Amino acid sequence: MVGIGKSEGDLRVLREPVVINRRAAITAGLAGAAALLSPVARAAAPPVGVVLTPQDTADLQRVAAYLSSIRTMYARFQQVSAGGGTATGQLWMARPGRMRFEYDVSSAILLLADMFYVYYVDKELAEMSKVGLKSTPAWLLLRDPVTFSDLVVTRFDRGANALRITVVEKAEPDSGSLTMVFSDQPLGFRQWTIVDQQRKATTVSLSNAQFGMALDPKLFVYQDPFAASRRQYEP
């Protein structure tokens, strides 16, 4: 399981065991979905960004180009919620606007973006929530092309072969922040953290990432898992 820490000015990759159970997976899944599903809110004050050096600006352009170049991706992930709940699983991404999370412990939980909406489904509880993709932090990662032109960089850390970048939206900075962590030389996307309006953080760390493969479009099609049960009660 991979997490990112900071020590003595460097960004380090930390490896530590985690205890995973069904309750933790559901808790983490709910927290992660809440972060991705959080709609943006109107800002009370303009955001304040850090002063970027020419090297920082060049690195931002490099990161934007790198992310935009990722057309498809498969990876294992570890997700940690604000309450400490931990879950693992696998994800698929296709640009623009499509992503699918499946959790190891509970196949009943699904998080899906289909270019238009982000869906959170819990089959055991027979619950589904959805919100427009472009109104969520997920859109910052899934849009095409990826750009920083409408974002404010509130933190930029450079370590030994690593970059950590925190951004908020210029128009709605109170909606939360997105922090991205990359290995460098060469660039590699390692982790993101979403902090929602309630200042609760959900972190997703990637491992065994693969890029550029053909993905079945059906992975990103929402299919109502409750349709059959509803039909049983229709007159």
Regions found by a protein language model. Name each.
Residues 70-72, 86-88, 94-96, 106, ...:
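Extracytoplasmic
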Residues 45-46, 90-140, 202-203:
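An acidic-aromatic
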Residues 1-20, 24, 28-38:
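N-terminal secretory signal peptides
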Residues 149-152, 156-235:
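Gly/Pro-enriched, hydrophobic low-complexity segments
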Residues 123-167:
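Surface-exposed, polar helix/loop patches in the mature regions of secreted/periplasmic/lumenal proteins
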Residues 65-82:
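A short, Trp-centered hydrophobic/proline-enriched beta-strand micro-motif
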Residues 81-83, 124, 198:
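Solvent-exposed strand-loop boundary residues in beta-sheet-rich modules
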Residues 19, 37-58:
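C-terminal segment of N-terminal export signals and the immediately downstream linker at the start
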